[in-house]
Amino acid sequence: MAAVGPPQQQVRMAHRQVWAALEVALRVPCLYIIDAIFNSYPDSSQSRFCIVLQIFLRLLGIFVSSIVLILSQRSLFKFYMYSSAFLLAATSVLVNYYASLHIDFYGAYNTSAFGIELLPRKGPSLWMALIVLQLTFGIGYVTLLQIHSIYSQLIILDLLVPVIGLITELPLHIRETLVFTSSLILTLNTVLVLAVKLKWFYYSTRYVYLLVRHMYRIYGLQLLMEDTWKRIRFPDILRVFWLTRVTAQATVLMYILRMANETDSFFISWDDFWDLICNLIISGCDSTLTVLGMSAVISSVAHYLGLGILAFIGSTEEDDRRLGFVAPVLFFILALQTGLSGLRPEERLIRLSRNMCLLLTAVLHFIHGMTDPVLMSLSASHVSSFRRHFPVLFVSACLFILPVLLSYVLWHHYALNTWLFAATAFCVELCLKVIVSLTVYTLFMIDGYYNVLWEKLDNYVYYVRSTGSIIVFIFGVVMFGNGAYTMMFESGSKIRAFMMCLHAYFNIYLQAKNGWKTFMNRRTAVKKINSLPEIKGSRLQEINDVCAICYHEFTTSARITPCNHYFHALCLRKWLYIQDTCPMCHQKVYIEDDIKDNSNVSNNNGFTPPNETPEEAVREAAAESDRELNEDDSTDCDDDVQRERNGVIQHTGAAAEEFNDDTD
């Protein structure tokens, strides 16, 4: 079999995309029905039976719409085929009824629907129009239900019988009989088709039930829901639902504005346009489904924004592509936390604008998490191309300027409250992170112009990063207090309390725990280094070797292990932070009271200074060691700094976690 060429692949790809778009479009009406049911309320003035019946019908409508929403593609198409066939049959019956029995039927058409004449009033033109209409209904009915052989012709003839009675001008009671008989035959045929398909429907339902139960037992509920979410393309359905809803509302409002202003111009004034936008935004988040739809639209915008920034700064990290997931989740959490859909229209607009400000700061934090690894990689790899550095520096400058501008605008339009305090704190925190990143970037760039090892570089990086981490931790504690004040005195809710617990755990407890663990590990590593003897001066020149870790020469001093291997103190400290063995021979790095005979192990290149045994070198070096490393002469996560120098940076991606405490 010949291989499929690129044109055929493109055709198949286009065919799949068309079917996928059609599938999404067919699922959208289910969301409209569910949204309409949720936005309608039963009339309390009716009897209890009527109220119970309405509630039952509402639940039944939600259940059926939900089932149709999650149907497979084949089952969904079959459902719409049968539904369309039944709709055509009902329309055909209604047309025959009104055309045959209502004398002023066409006058009713002429006085409705903007006065458009849909059919001619009398004569052969009327008969031909009715015949064509019934033929269209009949052919569509038998095609959708896949009725073959002579039965399809009989059904079409059955639909044309009332029209024939109208053409021959039969008496009214005979025409009534013909319409009733035609409707009865069509109804019986529909019931017969349903009875034939009932067996298929039963086995299909049973198969789906067994399949879902099997998947639930093997993979669990979470994976089952994720698979359904992806299979039905639920984010695309939400986007189409929200965009079509807003478009329909915009069309209606535009028509109302034009009628109110009594103008035929397509354009409207700026004030009317602003009112139109505000009304669309207010109605675009008036229910939980519309909030989900707005979240899906925000997800699409954030996704392409993240891809654009990644392409601009030249990053290829896969974890940085999660902006399209973080932004909508944060927006939806903020909407639930503040009760956005349940507020009055004026309050809803104000609350939505505040939530969007917090969302903007969160997106900027996430973008900083995307930019920082690229910035550190460029500086540590000593890339001197201006075209590689400019995009990252430009994005970093924007990340510093935008929070400042946002804070300036907010402080000039709002009075001080807990929400403004939270937004300002997030902006200041982002500016601080940018300053820390640019400072570390500058230090690494300065180090790139040195030909020797800058041993104090890691200490400076440690001071900068630790200072920034401490300030960020203080911001987290302050924001927790701000959220506690808001929950107790302004607007407390279970969702807010839950989010505060998450904030306290992730941004306060875990951050403090990890910081303390890092400090203790570094302290232990420093103590191990300080227990090793130091060699410097003339003995260092006699070694004539390089450090086995960084491959740089010994210029000022070196530490000697019990196995007589020499390393830079800084390099060995980084190694001991990972494991407690010698990088060369993998023996334990420790000093005992009585140093054992290690004469069988020499230094890095087998050299021993003349007139000196290895034991004497160790004892003399230990006696002459008068400089100890301080506990703060180390970096924040030394292994991370070494990775930065090699251009391999771990992406944190923690911008969204800092907003678990979003307040009013």
UniProtKB/Swiss-Prot annotation:
**Record-listed E.C. numbers:** 2.3.2.27
One GO term under biological process is: proteasome-mediated ubiquitin-dependent protein catabolic process
Looking at its record, which EC class is this enzyme? transferase
The catalytic activity, as recorded, is: S-ubiquitinyl-[E2 ubiquitin-conjugating enzyme]-L-cysteine + [acceptor protein]-L-lysine = [E2 ubiquitin-conjugating enzyme]-L-cysteine + N(6)-ubiquitinyl-[acceptor protein]-L-lysine
> Per the record, where are the segments of Acidic residues compositional bias?
629-639
**Annotated transmembrane regions:** 51-71, 85-105, 125-145, 154-174, 178-198, 293-313, 323-343, 356-376, 390-410, 420-440, 469-489, 495-512
Gene Ontology cellular component terms for the protein in this record? Derlin-1 retrotranslocation complex
Q: Give the molecular function GO annotations.
A: ubiquitin protein ligase activity; zinc ion binding
Q: Does the keyword Endoplasmic reticulum apply?
A: yes
Renumbered residue ranges of the record's region Disordered: 599-664
What membrane topology does the annotation report for this chain? Answer: Multi-pass membrane protein
Phosphothreonine is found on 635, 663
Note whether Transport occurs among the keywords: no
Compositional bias of kind Basic and acidic residues: 616-628
Query: Which locations, inside or outside the cell, does it occupy?
Result: Endoplasmic reticulum membrane
**Annotated Polar residues bias:** 599-610
Q: Cite the annotated pathway.
A: Protein modification; protein ubiquitination
Residues modified to Phosphoserine: 634
PTM annotation, UniProt = Autoubiquitinated. Ubiquitination is induced by sterol and leads to ist degradation via the ubiquitin-proteasome pathway.
Keywords carried by this UniProt record: Acetylation, Endoplasmic reticulum, Membrane, Metal-binding, Phosphoprotein, Receptor, Transferase, Transmembrane, Transmembrane helix, Ubl conjugation, Ubl conjugation pathway, Zinc, Zinc-finger
InterPro entries named in the record: HRD1_E3_ubiq-ligases, TRC8_N_dom, Znf_RING, Znf_RING-CH, Znf_RING/FYVE/PHD
Q: Which residues carry this modification: N-acetylalanine?
A: 2
Domain comment, as recorded: The RING-type zinc finger domain may be essential for ubiquitin ligase activity.
What does this chain do?
Answer: E3-ubiquitin ligase; acts as a negative regulator of cell proliferation through mechanisms involving G2/M arrest and cell death. Required for MHC class I ubiquitination in cells expressing the cytomegalovirus protein US2 before dislocation from the endoplasmic reticulum (ER). Affects SREBP processing by hindering the SREBP-SCAP complex translocation from the ER to the Golgi, thereby reducing SREBF2 target gene expression. Involved in the sterol-accelerated degradation of HMGCR. This is achieved through binding to INSIG1 and/or INSIG2 at the ER membrane.
* Subunit structure, interactors included: Interacts with VHL. Interacts with MHC class I and HM13. Component of SCAP-SREBP complex composed of SREBF2, SCAP and RNF139; the complex hampers the interaction between SCAP and SEC24B, thereby reducing SREBF2 proteolytic processing. Interacts with SREBF2 (via C-terminal domain). Interacts with SCAP; the interaction inhibits the interaction of SCAP with SEC24B and hampering the ER to Golgi transport of the SCAP-SREBP complex. Interacts with SEC24B. Interacts with INSIG1 and INSIG2.
Q: What is this protein called?
A: E3 ubiquitin-protein ligase RNF139
> What species is this protein from?
Pongo abelii
Primary gene name: RNF139
